Amino acid sequence: MYNHNLIEEKWLKKWKNKDVNRFESDSNKKKYYVLDMFPYPSAAGLHLGHVRAYTITDVISRYYKAKGFNVIHPIGFDAFGLPAEQYAINSNQNPGSWTDQNINNFINQLTSFGFDYDYHLSLKTTDPRYYKYTQWIFSELFKANLAELVDIDVNWCEQLGTVLANEEVLIDSNGNAVSERGSFSVEKRKMKQWVLKITTFADALLEGLDTLDWPEPIKEMQRNWIGKSKGVTINFQLKDHKEAIAIFTTKPQTIFGVSFLAVSTNHWLAKKIAETNKKVASFLKKQLQKTTTLKQKATLYDGIDLLTNAIHPLTNELIPVYVANYVIEGYGTDAIMGVGAHNENDNFFARKQKLKIINVIDKKERLQNSFAYNGLTTKEAQVAITNELISQNKAKLTTVYKLRDWIFSRQRYWGEPFPIIFDENNTPHLVEQLPVELPLLENYKPDGSGNSPLMRNQAWVNIVKDNIHYQRETNTMPQWAGSCWYYLGYLMLIKNPNFWPIDSKEAKKLFDQYLPVDLYVGGAEHAVLHLLYARFWHKFLFDKKLVSTKEPFQKLINQGMVLGPDGKKMSKSKGNTINPTPLVDSHGADALRLYLMFMGPISASLTWNDEGLNGMRRWLDRVYNFFFNHAVVTDQVSQETIFAYNLFLKNSYCHLDKHELNLVISEMMIFLNFLYKTKKISLNYAKGFLTVLSFFAPFLAEELNEKCGLEPFVVKQAISLVDYQLFETAKTKVILSINGKFKAAKEFTKGSLEIDVLESFKQDKEINDILNQPIERVVYVQDRIINVLLKK
């Protein structure tokens, strides 16, 4: 058993002394930009989820370097925001010094795992040299009228002392609005807030999704969040008011099934009636704590009759109007036409309120109970009714979006200051000299007043410029601001430790050279937060011609979670968390890296098993023992060895290209078993094997590379080439078995992969029809048999 602690310490020192991971920009090579979602530097340090995600990108980064690409693989720290501030408040520490301590700890941990980051390119969002450009981008948004200060109903969290974006609010099991962080109560409150007009880019954000190699569920979440709908806005005249209620609907063909109208608690009519109706006023007040968001439909279906009627635009019948908590605020017109027979939500509400339910569509999808439109198909009726309403000036064609503008203010201390000052007329002006630095505060706790803690520093707030008194904006930006553009920040650090100006020719050249990010790896939980916001900012910068790509991240991989030994998500409350640092001490970083990659496909969530880690360590001992005790290094190798070695390389590269990292480890195991049988390996073959091993286990690979007397460093070596001619002549017959019964046999090139063999058999229509049934599992014995087990 080798001493991993000594080997890791030795090679960390050598790599540092030779600056092995230093990034060198080379325009003569094809670029590859691989990026991790950068971490929030918590006091707890790295967890296994971090290590798994960062090992994925590290393996891929090393592979592309070995293929001759100019690879950039940076790391930084998302250090502003609520998590750091809340922890600092609870522990009575300054968030700045506390965050810097955590970052140093993170860097030490990241280094111990052997990741190939170049820390010359590292950044933190709390660095004024960095957030200078966060402020610069905001300034440009302001100049483009895409940032404005508005009085708006916001999600106010008393315990956190700040406003939350819609994306940061969840609905708990009782139907109450709560904060995503901490599950604190959230209520509606009208406040003056900065908003960014992300809705301006709604169509561009939708269209861009079709060009991205992202998991389809993530793209669908963004499509649903943007929520583009084409329909009709119909005016229902109120009987006792001059005004009409505008209703957006995508199903005008159901208009004869309307038995009520319902407006949201934020609708102008509900507010107007509440001024003179105490019951309505009480209902609206009660609903402030039960705000419906787009994330989850309301389950209570509460409502109250507004004691007014609307006039049906085609029948002139009177229709009761309700205020209801299931009507989504901010979508369409804040009002719906209730069609209980053809909408689940309307049905629940109608039955609860004992309202009529009128079925206007029969089982053949034709209209009934719809006067002159009876017998028309739903599509025919949709067109005919829409045209009739438009001809009477009672409707118009409309496109609406669920997406709301991004509330960008936070009433907290630990965030980027706005580059804004207000004159004596309360008119906002941009600060020209950036950055506007965040001042130190002794007391940065929110007081619940709605004012930022920065308001307490009057010496900072009040300034005089050209004999005019100004006050600084005291709200700060949300924690998502710095992460909207950090992938550009890394590029701005190339050959400039203080960042190239974002609008400089040097930065533009680097953006043109390295964008888009070729591979982005991170959690699926950021689908409608970071990933949407970053795309929005990037499209704005594209319109300004600062970047030349329409999208920032071309390919996205969501790594699966590492579950606790009990199969549940790791959490301190469950007592099933595992600290990776002691595992490095006991088993070595190489063993942990290998096990995290060998557990299964990178997108799958997998259960931690101590024995799996032990097994991986034993396998590394086998590798070590072969090279130190059993290997006979010679240039004389058999044809069988030549074929086995080239098959190992071919399959390994194929799996690496497909990001099937667990299968690469399987190929290494197969080849090592072969080596133990032959007890021989040439120096060239040793180099090829150790190069692949170095992607996963760089420490041991370096040690064995040195033992063989090969050129240092193995982590800088190019991959060995495959002799593909060997496979053009080497053929073998593979049998296809379905549920254990012979089905067919076919000739294949030796070493063919399972997916290729299966696809080849599927060329036969009869076999393809059978294999299109649900498959339980596939067992493939390479070059011999493939057995497909169908689900019963």
UniProtKB/Swiss-Prot annotation:
ATP binds at residue 572. Belongs to the class-I aminoacyl-tRNA synthetase family. A motif ('HIGH' region) lies at residues 39-50. Signal peptide: none annotated. HAMAP family: Leu_tRNA_synth_B. GO terms for cellular component: cytosol. A motif ('KMSKS' region) lies at residues 569-573. Pfam families: tRNA-synt_1, tRNA-synt_1_2, tRNA-synt_1g. NCBIfam families: leuS_bact. This is Leucine--tRNA ligase. It is an enzyme of class 6 (ligase). It catalyses: tRNA(Leu) + L-leucine + ATP = L-leucyl-tRNA(Leu) + AMP + diphosphate. Its EC number is 6.1.1.4. It comes from the Bacteria. The keyword tRNA processing does not apply. It comes from Mycoplasma genitalium (strain ATCC 33530 / DSM 19775 / NCTC 10195 / G37) (Mycoplasmoides genitalium).
